Amino acid sequence: MTDKLRKYVLPNIPYVFIGWVFLKLGTAYRLAAGGDFAHKFIGLGQTVSAAFADFAPGLAPFDWLVGIVGAVAFRLLIYFKSKNAKKYRRDAEYGSARWGNEKDIKPFVDPKFENNMLLTATERLTMNTRPKNPANARNLNFCGIGSSGSGKTRFWLTPQLLQAHSSYVVVDPKGGVLGQVGAFLQKRGYKIKVFNSIDFSKSMHYNPLAYIKTEADILKFVNALISNTKGEGKEGDPFWTKAETLLYCALLGYIIFEGAEEDRNMNTLVDMISGMEVKEDDEDFLNAVDYMFKGLEQRKPNCFAVKQYKKYKLSSGKTAKSILISCGARLAPFDIPQLREIMSYDELELDRMGDRRTATFFCISDTDSTYNFLVALAFSQMFNLLCERADNVHGGRLPHHVRVLWDEAANTGQVPNLEKLVAVIRSREISLCLLYQQLAQCKAIYDKNAETILGNMDSVLFLGGREASTIKEISENWLGKATISMQTEGRSRGQSESYSQNTQRLGRELMTPSELATMPGDRCILQLRGLPPFYSKKYDLKQHPNYRFTAEADKVKNAFDLDRLIDRRRRPGMNEECEVYEVSVPDEALTDEDEDILNYDDLDDPDAFV
């Protein structure tokens, strides 16, 4: 009813007054002396004041007829003039771009500081993706662009972790962020997980095969493995990649569904390929793996592994040897002893990050990218695992929002189908934050899909840089043009001096590429979907309420002890001799870290000990 009142009644109230005016003019005409129109019209001047002296409209039918006809005629006049009116946009002839202000961002900010995603020093975005007003709903996907030294880690990534409102997955070049905030998160009750490709002796274990449950999982894993180990340069004949895929699927199918639990890891896959001897001159030669699959075929002739292996065996001896060489080259990193040990079992629990507050750090080298593909491999599994767990266990939404803070996203490989995942993870309480040095890096990895990925980022932040294509994209497509006034002056001298001054309108970018390239180091530009861009100061880490808990504020008190975390969780090696002592420990003596090691939180999961 309120909407109808606002739409139909309120706009027509002024015409009631117009009708009253015409009614009074009708009264004046009726009271005027004379018998015809001309004499009555001349006599209006003497009766107008008397007609308007009384506010009451009276009951004379003639007066009401004049009032109604006059009001309707006036309304029709306004209607037709508005339909035929020329369209003018004053001060917006060439564009209406402007900088955003406090009023623009206010509806998107949560009153509680800790319930926001920090964007700049003055702009924040609520973590609530389902606000009361649907028009204010924004996804939490984010893209940050800034050249080296522009403050992507210090001014944006680290403050996000100090908010401590979600589960976090952090790609941490050099491991500096973990040392900065690890102790703070631990004190806040977070379960800390670390995969350290810089120093495997200070890393938890990651076994990608621990998350493979179905044949579809095998295909997803193989695609991710091949995508991130294809090396640089132009891709060769796709035949060899497809042949490798057949062999990987067959071997993984055997390992997952037929192998012992302790053998379900990448080491077994590498060992099986190493043991697949092929003789070019003897097509009937059978190696150890051939005999394994021959026995499996007798037991389960229609199983997935057998079908894939039979297709692989269609190749000749020479072709099979080339396939094995290609597989061996691709899996060469998994022959390194440190990596074999780190992938022997799993501690990361990638599928449980949304079940409780967890902070998982992937520490990578910023100078050597040998092992960086493992991060993309883990991420490709993690997104699918979290979506499946949200749908199958938690009714579509994870209990704890999971934020993926992916620093140096260009140096850690490719996640297959990321353009599709980024569009659907929002509803499962997962958000992706990508940090690049320039837009071209994203396009180099994901090609045409880069636009789809960036299009699903409601928040984009430019922290500074001078790469030409990036600043041109920002100037022309992010910021747009504003209409400005230009004043020109002219003066001519001769026999008679003349002076002229003209004002005209023209369009100008809010910031030109050259202005973006010379933007002050403490400034940034934020683009939030549906709002004008914001030209603001970067968030000062020292101004955060929890800054005092960082290692930078107090290195002695707040430094994170990674060695202690890893040593307490260490599992003896397969051939390591250990002495076991039976002791009784009172419950009050157990620490939070002991409880993490024992995984008491998994006792209610029927699949935890299968």
Predicted segments, located by residue:
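Extended alpha-helical interface modules used as scaffolds for assembling large macromolecular complexes
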Residues: 509, 548-549
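Conserved long hydrophobic alpha-helices within structured protein cores
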Residues: 113-119, 373-380, 474
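Generic preference for hydrophobic/aromatic residues in regular secondary structure cores
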Residues: 116-136, 146, 206, 383, ...
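Short alpha-helical interface patches
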Residues: 47-48, 52-53, 62-116, 215-225, ...
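Basic- and hydrophobic-enriched, low-structure N-terminal and domain-boundary segments
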Residues: 1-150, 154-157, 201, 491, ...
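Low-complexity, polar-biased intrinsically disordered regions enriched in Pro/Ser/Thr/Gly
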Residues: 126-131, 230-239, 261, 485-504
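Conserved ATP-driven motor cores of ASCE-family P-loop NTPases powering translocation/secretion/packaging/pilus
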Residues: 422-525
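P-loop NTPase motor domains
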Residues: 5, 24-27, 138-430, 445, ...
